[in-house]
Amino acid sequence: MSGYDGGYSGGGGRGGGGYGGGGYGRDRGGDRGGDRNGGGFGGRSNGNGYGGGGYGGGGGGYGGGGFGGGAGGDRMGALGSGLKNQEWDINSLPKFEKSFYKEHPDVETRSDADVEAFRRKHQMTIAGSNVPKPVETFDEAGFPRYVMDEVKAQGFPAPTAIQSQGWPMALSGRDVVGIAETGSGKTLTYCLPSIVHINAQPLLAPGDGPIVLVLAPTRELAVQIQEEMKKFGRSSRIRNTCVYGGVPKGPQIRDLSRGVEVCIATPGRLIDMLEAGKTNLRRVTYLVLDEADRMLDMGFEPQIRKIIGQIRPDRQTLMWSATWPKEVRALASDFLQDFIQVNIGSMELAANHRITQIVEVVTEMEKRDRMIKHMEKVMENKENKILIFVGTKRVADEITRFLRQDGWPALSIHGDKQQNERDWVLDQFKTGKSPIMVATDVASRGIDVRNITHVLNYDYPNNSEDYIHRIGRTGRAGAMGTAITLFTTDNQKQARDLVNVLQEAKQQIDPRLVEMTRYGGGGGRGYGGWGRGRGGGRANAHNANNMPIGNRRW
């Protein structure tokens, strides 16, 4: 059996047929270079998945790949040049249902004053004409029983703010813009209405593409969305697939050819599939753009426009974003019709107020020692998880090696890691087997790991928006969190913006940081510090995750 023969066990589709059994991994199983000295991640394949060997041993390079971009991932450039925008005659297109919302009696009788009070309490603002009232309970949302049973099985106490307002908006069939912080529950805000939408459409015929298309910026976010879709679409036997770069195309092509109601995709790989004729978007009537701001930041706008040009214009479109910059507004005005909008929280760039922000002004040479001091305190609690952000892939590997040599079970994730290594690292971090993860900015969005208690900015990012996205990995879903930032004179030009963020969130501010705001320019040159300190060095840094852990400190 060739590994990936199927992969989505059970389930089947609304029209019958299952995904079959099968494993995960193709015949060749292991990672390139994984068998030079035995061991390594994957080793030699046994034909059934990740192959023998452990995630240790010598050798084993992790080249290639790409993480939401780069070689092996979503290539850019001329991508989509083979796609022609479709000409649509609306009158000749098959009609479809998209309006399913029926206001619950309790919602209907709720006064305007009560509605306004609810919106104020949840920092909710709306825009557009005839925006439906928010719902306050799951029952008020009016989902069919097959959806509600799955929701209640998860044990959620009540809808989140974005769900309260977003569900009636999405179920009404209108085009929707939702602005809310990461971790606010927006995935379910569009997932559950999509299930209702799918079940109101004709069954897929052979050769049909998906009914629901979700575009996401990174593989990790795409996989997270797929997990939610699987969970809540199970009772409706809705089939889905995840289409992203950095892995073999064969299994994704197989899923698409068998027929799926839902396709979750990164733009680059989806365009590959469309150009190769492996799927089409003629049946798409429910389009979701998730983390639209991040997709534009990553340069996907031309690809998004190419993809939307393949979809009928009377579709329902839902756009979700953590921020509302002019680039996202322009995309919304081009592709959404008479849309209604909900914003949760301030429209200004602001940090989550449940996060305690600690900013220390240090020299470059002091950073490693300060990081260790914080680690010792944080990891006193064995339940804690810490995500460490660095500026480059090289530093990610250097810091990971340094931490492992110092006795800390750290692993790194960045754009030069193969997809199966990234998946393994994420799983180790999620399960707490390795509670310390070092990441570049490419991981600052789209990775949904619950219960991250601490974020440490070893290197400060290029702008305050990325700072807010980074620290937003903690303090999610109502929890408290802590963000620690090591700030050097090299970051001086960012000082004023950072002080503004800290003041807005009513945080304590290091007087030395305030002092920096009084001087312009880029600050001093710092002290370098590459490969210094305990166990530094760059030799063989690409193999940092295989580095043996020294005398354990955790």
Swiss-Prot record:
SMART domains membership: DEXDc, HELICc
Function according to Swiss-Prot or TrEMBL: ATP-dependent RNA helicase involved nonsense-mediated mRNA decay and ribosome biogenesis through rRNA processing.
Similarity remark: Belongs to the DEAD box helicase family. DDX5/DBP2 subfamily.
Gene3D superfamilies: P-loop containing nucleotide triphosphate hydrolases (3.40.50.300)
Domain of life: Eukaryota
Subcellular location: Cytoplasm; Nucleus
Reaction it catalyzes: ATP + H2O = ADP + phosphate + H(+)
A GO-annotated cellular component: cytoplasm
Composition skew (Basic and acidic residues), residue ranges: 25-35
Keywords assigned: ATP-binding, Cytoplasm, Helicase, Hydrolase, Nonsense-mediated mRNA decay, Nucleotide-binding, Nucleus, Ribosome biogenesis, RNA-binding, rRNA processing
Pfam families linked to this entry: DEAD (PF00270), Helicase_C (PF00271)
rRNA processing is among the record's keywords: yes
Name assigned to this protein: ATP-dependent RNA helicase DBP2
Chain coiled-coil ranges: none
Subunit structure: Associates with polysomes.
EC number(s) on file: 3.6.4.13
Enzyme class: hydrolase
Species in which this protein is naturally found: Gibberella zeae (strain ATCC MYA-4620 / CBS 123657 / FGSC 9075 / NRRL 31084 / PH-1) (Wheat head blight fungus)
PROSITE patterns per record: DEAD_ATP_HELICASE, HELICASE_ATP_BIND_1, HELICASE_CTER, Q_MOTIF
Binding site for ATP: 180-187
